Amino acid sequence: MKPPIFPPLTAPLPALDWHARARMYRDQALGMPDIVNGQPNWPRYFLLAHAVELAIRSVLVHAKTAGERAAGQEPGNHDLTALYAYACNLGLKSNLKVLDELQYLSEIHKNHVARYPKSLGQVWVASEFDDAVDALLSDTWQHIRVV
């Protein structure tokens, strides 16, 4: 049997692995155009939304590693707004910029519009979310980093 190309995640602080992966997705979205052939650049939306999901999940992994629990059940995948609220219940500092814009990106992510052709009323230009995504990555990093 061949060894895996990539070793399994065995870091003593797995939340850092989740956050590093979030940054990879965010970095790939940088510089991509918002519109391609007259259509929204759906891969850019996917990269941004997935970066957000992984960054939020880094907070959840951090809490789980520390033995913390939030009230209620963890929200399902792809509902970025609910995941963010859950992470805030675990101590992540709420950010008004993120709250204002996350609902729109969450809707696109939750309905898989960026992955599969579907009709969705109004779609915001992906670069409108850049500042909120960067703020979220900064906030989650501040929350999980080892001091």
PLM regions: where:
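Long, charged low-complexity segments
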Residues: 1-20, 26, 64-147
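Helix-loop segments that flank and shape redox-cofactor active sites
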Residues: 27-43
